[in-house]
Design a protein with these regions (language model features):
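Alpha-helical transmembrane segments of multi-pass membrane proteins predominantly involved
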Residues: 1-150
């Protein structure tokens, strides 16, 4: 029951931060809230027992990205104001892309299906070859340090 309360609280907090990011016009506030969004995502990953993913999200999403955004802010003119124009072509393209994504989701395998293609190809390869190919005994460390390093 406590885990459910924590999950609901973190998801509500994540949605609130996302709404605040969209509604805020101040660039500095958006950067700070983006860092808060990443930290909240990291907390959700910790609650899901994915501590390695949480650590990566906290380090990259809240740490390095926030520092880089703040560094870029030094090059953004303070007096520049965005125009209030609406681009209907961009809106139609976004709606079309969203419709195509929804169509593609219907073709995905069922959630948790052990016979889906991803479980037949990649996971067995990681489990059998990670120790001998990279000489790291822990499979999770191998995937994070070697294979995910390309991301």
């Amino acid at each position: 029951m406590a885990s459910l309360i924590i999950d609901v609280f973190l998801l509500v907090l994540l949605v609130l931060i996302a709404v605040m990011v969209v509604r805020t016009c101040k660039l500095y506030a958006v950067i700070v809230m983006s860092g808060a969004y990443s930290l909240t995502s990291a907390a959700i990953f910790v609650n899901l027992d994915a501590v390695d993913v949480a650590f990566t999200e906290a380090a990259v999403g809240a740490g390095i990205s926030t520092i880089l955004f703040l560094a870029v802010m030094a090059y953004v003119p303070a007096d520049e104001k965005p125009g209030l124009t609406r681009n209907f072509l961009a809106g139609f393209i976004c709606i079309g892309a969203g419709a195509l994504l929804l169509l593609a989701v219907t073709d995905l395998p069922s959630f948790g299906d052990p016979m889906s293609q991803v479980h037949q190809h990649v996971a067995p390869r990681y489990l059998t070859e990670s120790g001998s190919a990279l000489h790291i005994p822990n499979v999770v460390t191998t995937v994070l340090a070697s294979y995910r390093g390309f991301d």
